[in-house]
Amino acid sequence: LFMGAHPDDIELGCGALLADIVGRTELYCMTFSDNKKNPDLQHLLDEHYVSMRTLGLRDDQIEVGSFETRRFPDFRQEILEKMLQLKRKLKPQIVFVHTAQDIHQDHVTLTQEALRAFRGTTVLGYDVLRSSYGFFPHFLVEVSEAGVNKKIEALSKYTTYAERYYFSEDVLRST
């Protein structure tokens, strides 16, 4: 189970890994915010689906919630309940979520609730460059060059964010 607060988080943090393991194991990706309240991001949800499909995921492996961006702390209980539903439905062996060193309020809430919801399950944190502070991983997962290239291709589908520094190929390749 891969969980991210916003469209692009999962791809930024785990895109190469997803590309490497898709088709070899059961996968499910849950993005908690659709960002629909921001008129500048009107195409973001479509870009997210295209990006995830580029990584090899099917639409039935992708779910997007409607929690409002920057308001996750206000909906902590509802987020926890959604995670408990996912736990019952999917029975994941491993959960990927934002690193505990992330400072974005939505990412912090998601990680804290994941640690509560998935007690007894391996929960691993991934880095999203633009919002983590002091990220010192306990271990790294090796990914293939093909996986990295697929991550870069997938993130190129986000025309909304094309000019942001963390979407440059050099930055994506190094993260």
What spans do the regions from the language model cover?
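The feature marks non-catalytic terminal segments
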Residues: 55, 59, 89, 94, ...
